Design a protein with these regions (language model features):
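Active-site-proximal alpha-helix that buttresses catalytic centers in soluble enzyme cores
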Residues: 1-193
């Protein structure tokens, strides 16, 4: 599993505990690689299923994770890479159903800033799926000024600077801190080959 991680390769507890639970549920080793950490060694006697636990079609999903795949292959590993988590329709259905249960007037989805282009179509589709406005975190202060009653729902798997900042203005917790979303993701991951 590839995750973004925090400075120095730190991985939030909700991600490391998810990996521990997944390992127990699958009865198979699951390694965690944070993009912010040193490269982790692979188990040479096993094929690797590489899954980016990333929500957005940004540079990490399009460039960094394929580079990890190529590094592993050049080290002799047999690697199958799955699409990043945000490309899974079942994942978003799970998130949409959970978010719909906690909606309040003036709810707005807040996402990690992305470059224009490929992400635009993705974000338009996502906004339509939720039937909610979607605001980039770098535009949140302006949105909040124009809509002082807006209640942010951060679209982030784990705690990060965005979720911590939005929590100060009554934002929802990260997605993996919602028990239904966490269990749903665990079930989805357990059924992978």
């Amino acid at each position: 599993m590839v995750v973004h991680g925090r400075s120095g390769g730190l991985v939030p507890e909700c991600l490391s505990s998810l990996i521990d639970d997944l390992q127990a549920k699958r009865s198979a080793p699951v390694q965690l690689q944070a993009l912010t950490a040193e490269e982790c060694p692979y188990l040479p006697d096993r094929p690797i299923l590489l899954l980016p636990l990333l929500l957005w079609p940004g540079c990490h999903a399009r460039h960094d994770v394929p580079a990890i795949r190529e590094r592993l292959r050049s080290d002799g590993a047999k690697v199958t890479m799955l699409p990043f988590l945000g490309a899974w329709p079942l994942w978003w259905r799970l998130v949409v159903s959970s978010v719909q249960c906690q909606l309040e007037p003036d709810s707005v989805l807040v996402h990690h800033p992305l470059r224009e282009g490929v992400a635009d179509r993705f974000l338009t589709m996502l906004s339509a799926s939720f039937s909610l406005p979607l605001v980039s975190f770098d535009r949140w202060p302006e949105h909040q000024t124009q809509h002082p009653d807006a209640r942010p729902i951060p679209l982030a798997l784990a705690p990060n600077r965005m979720t911590e900042s939005l929590y100060q203005v009554d934002g929802s917790p990260p997605l993996l801190e919602d028990p239904l979303i966490r269990q749903g993701l665990l079930d989805l991951l357990a059924f992978l080959p």
